[in-house]
């Protein structure tokens, strides 16, 4: 259980680490438009993202896919930027948009998984039996994501319910900030 606990902790700490705020920004942008009463939709979004990053994390760790880390480091903020833009133009009542959002969470998870893989590969080294470590790391990532979602729900509740800020204004303001930060990140990481 020692290995499992270690990699679970590392996955959790990796996604909740402020130094790696790009993943935090993505989860924030992904669930920001949803009130806590729509927790099922958020759970589906986070699960789709987890499935995506789990697939590419495993494929990359097992050297089945190799993509330049400079491209991945560029594409990660692009996924954040697109998600923040979608928040600005989004209509919560349109189920077609929700299906698109689920699909984009899965697709963007594929990109983020390759970013996670660089970190995980550096810890694993040449160990041949890495299934347990891979599972533990993914579970840790998922737990960290759920903590971020809870924080978003709580902070949004404070601003929208207690401070009476209109939800659409809150979403627009925070998404605008996320857009600006991710644009700067993308420009700083241009791979060409």
List each model region and its residues.
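Membrane-interfacial alpha-helical segments at the cytosolic side of multi-pass membrane proteins
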Residues: 24-40, 63, 85-87, 123-124, ...
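Membrane interface segments of multi-pass transport proteins and intramembrane proteases
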Residues: 64-68, 91-96, 155-173
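Interfacial helix-loop-helix junctions of multi-pass membrane proteins
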Residues: 6, 57-74, 118-138, 147, ...
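Final/C-terminal transmembrane alpha-helix of multipass membrane proteins
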Residues: 29, 171-189
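Divalent metal-coordination and catalytic microenvironments
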Residues: 23, 53, 81, 112, ...
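Membrane helix-loop-helix hairpins that form the core translocation module of multi-pass transporters
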Residues: 41-94
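Histidine-/acidic- and/or cysteine-rich, low-complexity loops and terminal segments associated
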Residues: 1-24, 93-97, 186-192
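Juxtamembrane transmembrane-helix termini in multi-pass membrane transport proteins
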Residues: 10-60, 64
